[in-house]
Regions:
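Bacterial Sec signal peptide processing site at the extreme N-terminus
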Residues: 20-42, 56
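Alpha-helical linker/edge segments of TPR/alpha-solenoid repeat scaffolds
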Residues: 78-103, 108, 144-163
Length: 163
């Protein structure tokens, strides 16, 4: 009778170990989604605290993640129908859209603070960086923001002086 008990305990220990190991396995997709969320939250927290440089670094981290995911998707493009590639592509789009939205928010931050040259530079950076067809709505919003800035703070023109 002790033999079946020992076997039963071994089985229970084996099941418990399997469950523990399974819970330790990482879902890299979820980890990266959480990283994007954390960097985006930190971006806005830094803007609220007027730590612009830190906010920019957080957004650059999101851009780097999107770029890395884009490379992974391109390398695995031949594996069509792969749920891993589809998840990676969806996460890449999310990271890219998040970063673009954050740049627009940074431009708005500068405009509110009446730092018009920085706002213009931020919008131009966004327009120059996000050139894919899927980025069009963000580019158009940045172009509208530039036109709005021109109404608030017309660009200075240097005219030649007459001697």
């Amino acid at each position: 009778m002790t033999r079946p008990r020992v076997a039963s305990y071994r089985f229970m220990v084996l099941v418990a170990c399997s469950l523990i190991l399974a819970s330790c396995a990482h879902d890299t997709y979820q980890e990266r989604a959480d990283q994007i969320k954390n960097h985006s939250g930190a971006f806005y927290d830094n803007l609220k605290s007027n730590r612009v440089e830190s906010a920019i670094r957080d957004n650059e981290q999101i851009e780097a993640m999107a770029s890395e995911m884009g490379n992974t998707v391109r390398k695995r493009a031949g594996q069509q129908g792969s749920s891993t590639v589809e998840r990676e592509f969806a996460l890449m789009k999310t990271a890219n859209e998040t970063a673009a939205t954050n740049w627009l928010a940074l431009g708005q931050y500068f405009a509110i603070k009446r730092q018009y040259p920085q706002a213009r530079a931020t919008y131009r950076r966004m327009i120059d960086t996000y050139t894919n067809p899927t980025d069009r709505p963000h580019r158009e919003q940045a172009l509208r923001a530039l036109r709005d800035l021109d109404m608030i703070d017309p660009p200075t023109t240097t005219s030649p002086t007459n001697p």
